[in-house]
A protein has these predicted regions:
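Conserved alpha-helical scaffold segments that buttress catalytic/binding sites
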Residues: 1-206
Length: 206
């Protein structure tokens, strides 16, 4: 599903995957922010899975979404509360900020870490938040006006990641934070989908 924001292109995809899965569900999420506030800050309504809390709402609503099978990639924003991130880490989440990707793992090393989403799971949900590009990738530096942070993921890195995910398989995926009128980002999403499909095809030919 390709959409502009949450919950229509995040929680709304995670929910049916969880409801239809016979076992545990892993998640691979690329993002600049954790989107894991305890409550939606725009409405203050605990029922809402909004842009800032859809991920925490997913894990609190569906017991088969497994935090030890969460692979969280790309965050480097300074808007997060440390207690929120530490809570996920203490519960077994696998976190790869862009600093770690660039200074230690590289894209090849990062792709190896995708295994955590698949270990012991029956399904995997993949979420591409395109604000991960802001500040370095092909998206405008002021992606959606305010979401850019330094050390963004490059177009090659996100395409390579999608290709490797395709080789491993997935149940469903979604895109959000697509800059309106950004033709290069639109094209990048087409590349992500195409290279992911190529990965699926390669896995089935082996």
């Amino acid at each position: 599903v390709v959409g502009q924001n949450s919950p229509c292109s995040s929680y709304a995809i995670a929910k049916p995957i969880a409801e239809r899965s016979a076992g545990k569900v892993g998640m691979i999420s690329t993002d600049t922010h954790w989107d894991s506030r305890p409550i939606d800050y725009l409405t203050g309504d605990e029922r809402i899975a909004g842009s800032g809390n859809w991920k925490s709402k997913t894990f609190s609503s569906f017991a088969n979404f497994s935090i030890p099978n969460l692979v969280e990639i790309g965050e480097r924003g300074m808007l997060e509360e440390a207690s929120v991130v530490r809570n996920y880490m203490q519960r077994g989440a696998h976190f790869y900020p862009m600093w770690k990707v660039r200074s230690e793992l590289g894209i090849a090393g990062l792709c190896k870490e995708l295994r955590h989403a698949y270990e012991g799971t029956d399904d995997v949900y993949v979420h591409f938040d395109m604000d991960i590009l802001g500040g370095a990738g092909p998206a405008p530096g002021d992606i959606l006006g305010e979401l850019a942070e330094p050390m963004g993921m490059s177009d090659y890195e996100i395409i390579r990641l999608a290709h490797e995910i395709g080789k491993r398989g997935l149940t469903g995926m979604s895109f959000i934070c697509i800059p309106p009128g950004s033709m290069v980002t639109y094209r990048l999403i087409v590349y992500i989908i195409a290279f992911l499909i190529a990965g699926l095809a390669l896995s089935r030919s082996d």
